[in-house]
Amino acid sequence: MRIKNNNVNYIYMVITILVMTFSMRATNNMVITTTPLLAKIDLHFSEFYVGIISTVIYLFMFVVTFYINPRLNHKLRKKLFITANAALIFVLLSYFFADAITIWLSSAIAGLAYGIMLPNLITSSSLLKDQKQRERLISLYSVGLSLSLILGPSIEYYLLTIVDYRYVFLFFIPAVFVGFITSLFIKFPETKNETRKNVLKNDGLKAAMLTITTYNIPFAALSIFLTLFAISRFHVSGSVAYSPYIYFFSVSLATRFMMMLRPFKSIRLPLIFSIAITGLVLSLFPFIPDFTAFIVLMMLLGIPHGSIFPISTIMISRGTTLEQRNAANSYFMGYNNILFMIVPLIFGYIVGVIGYENSFLVLLIPVVISGIYLFKIYGENKMFFPGNKKISASKSL
């Protein structure tokens, strides 16, 4: 009976997390990628101010994830989680009516909402005590992220063929409503001894931060400027320029699905491979001959996008206790928000000076530095790199 109850509980967590992940991440990606287009094309912002409007979203996400969420108990976090999902319905409506002034307020509120949602959803996906089940659920969560990032851009790609950017926000409201209903059933940790003491010094968190740096610096730039780069370089329409996201996230989904089916106990070789692909693709950006070649490069970048995030979250789950995990995930997401806040701003400025192609080449520098530092500090850490033996998928459930 206990085994049956455990299976029912596991299935319940899988369903609620996957549905919540789709609602949250599909709309989050839409807001992050469409707001710059609305600012640039409808409101005539410069590249620099396009970078700033994107920074506003991540600034408010950072404030919540880094300073507020780690200090809240699980009961209050759950109430705010539900409230944030409800608030997003009104945020999408406000984007539809936004002008050059109100778009800043809409972006700030969106950042606050996602700041409470993202770290708590990651924590909910890592509650299980059994390591194999926990890492399988983390992989399923990552698969849900990628699936939402395929269906979301696919829907937006179709919508942009029939409506302008403002109406896209309206069409995503039903997905947010589903997320609001699902948020009522998401499980939160019930431990009474949650702590954030010394979490910033935790090796699992620090290794995860270095790992995510190897990819999220270029991805922070791509998530904001990919469509604008495609329009500028290849002179394609807005809907066509948006289409590389679909191929990109499809490869990411395939990568995460394979990691779910055949998880590795050691992540050394997959991590090295992912960092190498990122560096290779960035070095080829100045030499892209046509739009088809651009799509191929984006598909290659989908591999590290699929692998780096789940590897980072697995590092946190291996290196922290349940009592530390909310704070660790909050600080981890806060760090990501810093990257997505600073990189677009700097990248937007650099683009205005040296152009898109050379700007992407500059992104190689932090990728290489963070990768080298990661393996120098943690390359022999057996908690993260115990060997290359695979964990049997059949025994993970």
Residue spans of the language-model regions?
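Helix-to-loop junctions at the C-terminal end of transmembrane segments
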Residues: 64-76, 255-267, 351
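C-terminal membrane-cytosol helix-exit motif in multi-pass small-molecule transporters
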Residues: 173-191, 373-378
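Helix-loop boundary and gating motifs at the non-cytosolic
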Residues: 8-53, 58, 216-233
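Cytoplasmic helix-loop-helix junction between adjacent transmembrane helices
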Residues: 108-143
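A late C-terminal transmembrane helix in Major Facilitator Superfamily
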Residues: 324-354
